Amino acid sequence: MSVIVPIHGPAIAPAPAPERVGVLLVNLGTPDSCDTKGVRIYLREFLSDPRVIENQGLFWKLALNGIILNTRPARKAKDYQKIWNHEKNESPLKTITRAQAEKLSASLGDRGHLIVDWAMRYGNPSLRDRIEALVAKGCTRLLVVPLYPQYSAATSATVCDQAFRVLRELRAQPTLRVTPPYYRDSAYIDALATSIKSHLASLTFEPELIVASFHGMPQAYIDKGDPYQAQCVATVEALRERMGVADDKLLLTFQSRFGFDQWLQPYTDKTIEALARKGVRKLAVVMPGFSADCLETLEEIAQENAEIFMEHGGEEFTAIPCLNDSDAGVQVIRQLVLRELQGWL
C-alpha cells in the first residue's frame, strides 16, 4: 500500500487586493495652534529645510536656534491669531485645503477605486501620515498634487523630496506621479480673470489699478536657475491678455521677504507705498501664486499692506480672495488631476 507524502512548499501569497489610485493635494503648511509654541514648532521645521534656506551652515543654525526661534514665533503668533479659524481651531489654509479635497472628490464622481486626500509639507496632516494612510487603503498608484501654480525648488521640489523620503522606507512602493506647474494653464488663467472681475464688480469703488503680488524668494535662487520668477511673469502676461488690460494697470510684485539678502523685486509693500505717494487712491491686490488664502494673503496683504496704503494717502483698498474652494478653483484642480491620471482611470 503506497503512502502519499504531503509536499510542504512555500506558502501561497494571498491574491492582491483591488488596486486603488490615491490623489494627494499638498500645500505649504500651518502651525497646529496659534500660540508661540505652535508657531515655533512650525517655523523650526520650515526654516530647517535646505530647499527653503539653502545655506544651512553653522551661522544659520546659530541664528535660527539662538535668535529667530526665540523672537519670531511670538510676533507671528499674533499675526496668526488675527486670521485663525477659532470655530475649527485651525488656520484658514487647513480649512480651505480640506474643503478643496472634499469638493474635488465629489466632483470626480463615483469612482470607488479613487481616493482623494490632502496634506501639508510642514505641520499636519503630514505627507508621511497621508501617504502611509493611502497605501494602507490599497493605493498602488499615487498622484501628488503640489498646489503651487508656479514651480519653485522651495515649494514644489521639496514636496517631491519629502514624498520620496516616505517611499524610500516602503517595501511595497506605490507608483508615483506628480502634477506639473500650471502657471499659464488656460483654466487657471480664466478662473483668475473671472474671479478678479467678479470681485471688482461687487465693490462700491473702482480700483485705479491692480497689483499682482506673488510670494518672493532670494534673488540668488533665481540666479542659480530656479524658474519661479519667469513663471510668475508668464502668469501675469497671460492674465493681462485674458483681461485686456495694459501693463501699467496690472503690476507684478513680490511679497514676504525675510532676512537681509536681496529678494525678487519690485517689493509689494514698497510698491504699494509708492503708488499711494504718487496719488493712487483706490487699489486692488490679487495673489495669483496662492491657491488658498493663508497668513500671507489674509494678514500680510489684506491687513498690513492695506494699512501701508492708507497711511500714505490711499483711500480704498481691497484684497481679492484666492480661488480657494470655489467652483472655479476646484475645477482648475480637477482638470489638472484628470489630465495627469490618464491611463490610470
UniProtKB/Swiss-Prot annotation:
Taxonomic path? Bacteria, Pseudomonadati, Pseudomonadota, Alphaproteobacteria, Hyphomicrobiales
Please give the organism.
Rhodopseudomonas palustris (strain ATCC BAA-98 / CGA009)
Task: State the similarity comment.
Answer: Belongs to the ferrochelatase family.
State the Gene3D superfamilies in the record. 3.40.50.1400
Q: Which reaction does it catalyse?
A: heme b + 2 H(+) = protoporphyrin IX + Fe(2+)
Q: Which UniProt keywords apply?
A: Cytoplasm, Heme biosynthesis, Iron, Lyase, Metal-binding, Porphyrin biosynthesis
Q: Which residues bind Fe cation?
A: 215, 296
Q: What does this protein do?
A: Catalyzes the ferrous insertion into protoporphyrin IX.
List the EC numbers from the record. 4.98.1.1
Per UniProt, subcellular location reads as:
Cytoplasm
NCBIfam families registered for this protein in UniProt:
hemH (TIGR00109)
Name the predominant localization: cytoplasm
User: Which HAMAP family does this chain map to?
Assistant: Ferrochelatase (MF_00323)
Provide one Gene Ontology cellular component.
Answer: cytoplasm
| Pathway(s) | Porphyrin-containing compound metabolism; protoheme biosynthesis; protoheme from protoporphyrin-IX: step 1/1
Q: Biological process (GO) annotations?
A: heme biosynthetic process
Name this protein carries in UniProt: Ferrochelatase
One MF term in the entry's GO annotations: metal ion binding
